[in-house]
Amino acid sequence: MLDTSADAVLRALNRAYMRRPVLAMVLAAVFGLAVIEGLAFGAPAGATLLFGSLAVLAVVVVSRREIEYYSEAVEYVLDDHATVAYRSLVTAFSRLKTSGPIWHLGRRTTDGQRRHRRLVVPVLALPPRVRSNIRVPALRAGRQTLYFFPDRILVYDTQMAWGIEYRDLKVKGGDVREVTEIGAGGDWAECNGFLALMSRSGLSALFRCADVKAAAEVASALEGLA
């Protein structure tokens, strides 16, 4: 990230993330009242429908413009080494995406044995209200979404965004049959690959997949960015 500290970037991203499109909301309220008054005073149904349709279109356009205006720009200029390392991560995620189903394993069930699981799909995307010169791998993890930028993971939940530098990330990946300490969610004959991401700042995400090698490649690429 350029021209600013990591803390300043996170503050700016959180301001943008929490900002609501106030102008669009006001316009929606005004147009809604206008439609109600038109119906109350006997305006033709066709004219009211046309006005309502145009009002909805105007609110959508204004909302998008407002969100774009208040978005934060995050630009990257990578040296050759960082470029190679980051491309390795993007390539590894692409392979993981095409390797078969990927499951995020959440908290354990009440019996303490099984974990809740949810099907997820890696994508190239950006966090809400962020503009950038790159698209980054993103992965849902329960109520959080993990965005893998070149210098850190940005974690977005329903209330805020926070960052984890790769040197502070503990990552494991490979064949779940070769580990016992992570509690990887039981035996699934079709999903022997796993990827575990942990940090002292509170991240704890566990994924299962069909391709053991793809999971190991993602873990290796993440370690290469540390």
What are these regions (language model features)?
Residues 1-13, 53-135:
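N-terminal topogenic membrane-targeting module
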Residues 27-37:
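Hydrophobic, membrane-inserted alpha-helices
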Residues 36-54:
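Hydrophobic alpha-helical transmembrane segments
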Residues 128-163:
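Conserved beta-hairpin
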Residues 157-176:
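Conserved mid-sequence domains
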